[in-house]
UniProtKB/Swiss-Prot annotation:
Keywords: Amino-acid biosynthesis, Arginine biosynthesis, Cytoplasm, Lyase. GO terms for molecular function: argininosuccinate lyase activity. The lineage of its organism: Bacteria, Bacillati, Cyanobacteriota, Cyanophyceae, Synechococcales. One of its GO terms (biological process) is arginine biosynthetic process via ornithine. Its main location: cytoplasm. It is found in: Cytoplasm. Coiled coil: none annotated. PANTHER family: ARGININOSUCCINATE LYASE. Pathway: Amino-acid biosynthesis; L-arginine biosynthesis; L-arginine from L-ornithine and carbamoyl phosphate: step 3/3. One of its GO terms (cellular component) is cytosol. Gene3D superfamilies: Fumarase/aspartase (C-terminal domain), Fumarase/aspartase (Central domain), Fumarase/aspartase (N-terminal domain). This is Argininosuccinate lyase. Its EC number is 4.3.2.1.
Amino acid sequence: MSKVWSNRFESSLNPFIEEFNASIGFDKTLIFEDIDCSIAHAKMLGKTKVLSADESQKIIEGLENIKQDFIKGEFSPGAPSEDIHYSIEEKLIDLIGDTGKKLHTGRSRNDQVGTDIRLWLRKKIDTIDNLLAELQNSLFAVAESNIYTLIPGYTHMQRAQPLSLAHHFLAYLEMFQRDRERLREVRARVNISPLGAAALAGTKIKIDRYFTASELGFDNIYKNSIDAVSDRDFCIEFASASALIMSHLSRISEEIILWVTDEFSFAKLTDKCATGSSLMPQKKNPDVPELIRGKTGRVYGNLHTLLTLIKGVPLAYNKDFQEDKEPIFDTVDTISSCLKAMRILLDEGIEFNVDKLIDSVNNDFSNATDLADYLVSKQVPFRKAYQIVGDIVKYCLTKNILFKDLNLSEFQTFHDEFKEDIYENLNPMNVVKSRNSVGGTGFEQVEIELNNWKKKLFT
């Protein structure tokens, strides 16, 4: 099959180079967007009288038929067409004859593909936002059920202070909310139309860029035709926002992987979300969070690919940009599957070992700060109280005991302000309850935050 650009050439393309040059193998993903873009363009050409009303309508009907043929499996874009744009145009010409050759008037593949990818990505951003909302609902459900479940909090992977498990999961709700906000910001820059910029300089054909932008649901148009066809910032911004989403998924995955180990035993996996070993019959493997953690690197790699792709390309459009689609397609597929998998894992794949969690917070020194705070409440300066508690910790370690094992007279050897109520202050439930500053892990604050999230998520 001859190429539309072949008249300028004296010999045909080397078969391998033809295959190397083609993008139809992956840009056929954009078939619906390409058809919608062409329908809007044909309507505009009719509106501006570049095409007659009959020609415009004939093209539109032909494009609609191609869409239906594809849905029914009667049209399958592929080689020898170079890309999805030519594949559809060739099919259109087959259907309606020479009138189909007028469709490309006033545009280039450069602005056409830029429009297609924006239409596709806009839709996928909305889908990912919905998946994030569903994940937030699952996180909320776990939090709401575990207000009074305590878990050791860590800094530097060392026991720090006890927390409400609900508070822990609310932290992830905040992270994913920021992710949703970033996606909305990216969407705003995705939703600008390059259509009508043509190859790079605009066109002398009478077109109406604002009309096609409105038809396709764009908020605005690019004001500079060179920028319109050469901009791939929006791809990088999306990949960056996606990398952050994956980093948050990877963090919670890592925690779940730790929690379900025998060493932690804070939780266990249900049979619905675990696999076994081909050799070791006792194993129950956390494949879901491990895969999410692993796929994070894949999304990071896609971001790096896109950054590298544009770092040295001069204005305006370059064939390098053909390489922007697969990283974006892969990122969308990967992040969508990981969000779904994490939601299922939270909904039906993990059960918390409450007895182990209670035992953990009752048998460590994570209430040391509260011991210092107790002395502060007795007008002991914090730095002095800190030093006193450090001495008590050291004493307990030499005796292989905990604070709760000390009798009152032992406490009072370190400071005479220790009274009988010290034991109540060291109780883990009271420790958590007392952290009632705004945004803290205190039960009252956690309930306030849960109510705030309920309004955000369900109203």
